[in-house]
Amino acid sequence: MAVAAWIGGAVSLLALYFLKEGITDGGVLYGINRSIHHVDMNIVVIPGAIGSLLTGLLYSLFSHWGFFKHNWLTFKWIVTLTAILFGTFFLGPWETAMMEISGKIGIASLTDSAYLYNQQMNLMFGTLQVLVLIITLFVSILKPWKSKKQA
């Protein structure tokens, strides 16, 4: 359920970006950016990511799967931790900057180089992150790699 919140929330963020097309009111632009920020930080994405991390931790600690017993588990740990760190140090700050800029200068944000940079980075890497998370979901379901050889 946590991964559904994480991926579903991230897809929702991408969908909200497309509401910006044709906007002529700075208040509406700020409202969309604030909504994106709220869905990400408070309601769905971050709680889903934390829930996924905690669920993985509990399964690894209290089941026969372990932490790195299988290659697919190692892959999932790497992706999960990388995605959380990338979201924390890059996607989140880009998103916050967009909200702050549009709150200050309104519709002029759409021609502001800092706003446009943050929007481009967030959209491009946010889309990439969603795709990687979906691939990771399929890896979790299919468990494609055999367990590591025991030494």
Enumerate the predicted regions with their spans:
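Polytopic transmembrane helical bundles with strong interfacial aromatic enrichment
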Residues: 1-151
